[in-house]
Design a protein with these regions (language model features):
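Short, flexible, mixed-charge glycine/proline-rich loop motifs
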Residues: 99-108, 142-148
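Short Cys/His-rich Zn2+-coordinating modules
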Residues: 88-101, 133-140
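Histidine-centered nuclease catalytic patch
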Residues: 117-150, 166-168, 175-181
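C-terminal, charged low-complexity interaction regions
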Residues: 1-26, 202-289
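Domain-level detector of nuclease and nuclease-like folds
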Residues: 161-220
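A conserved active-site cap/scaffold subdomain adjacent to cofactor or substrate pockets
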Residues: 151-152, 162
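Short cysteine-rich loop/turn motifs with clustered Cys
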Residues: 102-129, 155-158
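N-terminal accessory alpha/beta regions
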Residues: 1-97
Length: 289
């Protein structure tokens, strides 16, 4: 995988240097217990095991969970702030370079995968790029600070809301690279005002709902994501936009869309393209990215 290789080549040197520094511990600045957890995992016969470094830097979701089970939590406290600072430093070095700033764009993430409402633009020359959330918080698992599949390009609102939520112990949030809302999770409006359904009033509340056949694990993660990231609150800021969508749904019937397709056959490939044009969005799951 090209992206994996590029990511590993970019960060491995700084990671290897830090591991050597931690092992030497010349100034005795690291907490012995935490230091030994790092050394015991990464070193074999007094040498760094590169396969384990590769696993930490480019391993997938399941691989990272395995690493966490072996190394465990390295809590940041006054006795071992230095170890966390070292991992924080190599992470900051990554985000301060063009490779790190453009990583989200390179892997094709243009909209925050947590809320799916905020664009995350990457224009390094103008000082604009996404923030990176650590799905497994670096405050507890600092050795995953530069793990490719632990870095979630996201918007500042979601990054701040999630903060140091421990997604390993309580499995609280959807993992954006592998899990999704899809067609099984949807938004619904709640209102006593009938005009809302015609898009003529925005006096309603937006709620996240799930189909009856959705697995309980997914349903719980969706509820947790909504609570922790304030998804419903954020979407209720856009009632006016939702009203316009409802009005469009009422006005632009299937018959109307078919008439557009028949009248302008050279403009639209099929009915899906007509509806995408009317709603200014892709309604087909395979095009969501």
């Amino acid at each position: 995988d090209k992206n994996k290789n590029e990511f590993y080549d970019d960060v491995k040197e700084s990671y290897l240097k830090l591991l050597n520094k931690i092992k030497k511990n010349e100034k005795k600045i690291y907490n012995i217990e935490n230091r030994n957890k790092i050394i015991d995992y990464f070193y074999e016969d007094d040498k760094i095991c590169e396969n384990k470094v590769i696993e930490v830097i480019t391993g997938d979701h399941k691989a990272l969970e395995k690493v966490i089970k072996e190394i465990g939590v390295l809590e940041k406290n006054k006795d071992d702030k230095k170890l966390h600072d070292e991992f924080e430093s190599i992470y900051n070095n990554f985000t301060n370079r063009e490779f790190g700033r453009t990583w989200g764009k390179k892997i094709g993430v243009e909209i925050c995968p947590y809320c799916n409402r905020s664009f995350i633009y990457t224009t390094p020359k103008k000082g604009t790029w996404p923030q990176y959330d650590h799905y497994y918080p670096k405050s507890k698992y600092p050795y995953l600070a530069l793990s490719m599949y632990n870095l979630i390009p996201c918007c500042p609102v979601c990054n701040n809301a999630k903060n140091a939520e421990d997604t390993f112990d309580n499995k609280s949030l959807l993992y954006p690279f592998e899990e999704e809302y899809g067609y099984d999770i949807f938004f619904e409006i709640e209102t006593d005002e009938q005009l809302c359904y015609l898009g003529l009033s925005n006096d309603f509340n937006i709620k996240i709902k799930s189909k009856e056949n959705v697995e309980e694990d997914l349903k719980q993660k969706v509820q947790n994501s909504s609570k922790i990231l304030h998804i419903e609150e954020l979407y209720n800021l856009h009632n006016d936009y939702v009203s316009k969508l409802l009005r469009s749904k009422y006005i632009f019937t299937d018959e109307y869309c078919q008439s557009l397709l028949d009248t302008y056959p050279g403009w639209f490939f099929d009915m899906n393209e007509v509806k995408n044009q009317l709603y200014f969005n892709s309604l087909q799951k395979e095009e969501w990215g």
